[in-house]
Amino acid sequence: MTKLVNSARLVELDVDVVSAAFRRFDRIFSAPYPVSLALSGGKDSLCLHDLVYRYVTTHPEVRRRLDVYFCDEEAIFPECEDCMRFAREQWASVGVSFYWLALPFKHNNCFHSLEDAETWVCFDPKARECWVREPPDFAIKSHPIFQFPGQWNFQQALAILTRGRIRVAGVRANESLQRLSAIKRALAKDGGEFRLTPSRLQYPIWDWKDSDIWLYIKERGIPYPRCYERIYAINGKRKLRISQFFSIDTAGSLARMAEYYPGLWEKICRREPNAYLAALYFESEMFRRTSRSQVSGTGGRDYKALCMDLFKSGNYAKATDVRSLLYNAVSYAVYMTPDLWRELYNILSAGDPKQRSKRAFLASLKSRLNT
């Protein structure tokens, strides 16, 4: 188990992560509030689902206070749907409500990166004839909180639907520098434990590493989407993302993954016409892939000049964000390495809707300033 000390560093404790998660469940369910569990169908949420399910079967008194939500993104792999159907059956067997939400959530779309906005809408009524797949008959397909399609993303919608309840999610600090920083700030502010109040998010597996996730899946024999194995063969272990088909983290591997699913690529291109870019430019900087010559510094490209050219083109809807990044880069040019210029160029050319790469870039620049 990992613990934060003085909000600045991590230390290892003599407690395994599974036992730590169950201790957190004791604390969560001891609070006098109902609890909601949010699932995505990915590896983290499957582990969290199994942990909570085990806890509920040994603590039947908490069943009436728990409900489970799954946000269907329309464009998902068949194995993900199968895993969530199985999870639904498990929760039904213990009398816990399971809500399958097939609502018009908005999502990031890297194929429209110049807009830098959440432009793709799941189960958009205006594009019904082009849906990648139909939702199950039992799914919730409309809700009063949506006055128009794409009004909310799934995080915003869940916050509204579960207002007054403690929300449990499978977010881990190990996933990115940004999540680690956010969790550190939250724990430091709350005194070492996430504050238990209605509508507050709880992260029982925040300190799990990737190896903990896969070891737990193996030891428990949890059914998981086999598409992870195919993505591993394509992208390696650091890019195992299967949700949000059109986000920058997933879109690049779409064309290759579709080879395993007959008819899927045609459905994807019909739903998002710009998806052909993933097939044409998967091995390029558009999807943040770097050749050996670029890594070794022999690529012969002046990324500083390329960054300036991109900015001068004036094609960005949010030019203030670009100007801010370039201002930091130019102001501290003496600290900018070729790798940092290349990283900045990738952000500007490939898009960064969630601004994760922007925060990572600024953190790298800050670390250079402090050395």
Regions found by a protein language model. Name each.
Residues M1-S36, K43-T371:
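Nucleotide-activated chemistry modules centered on ATP-dependent adenylation/adenylyltransferase
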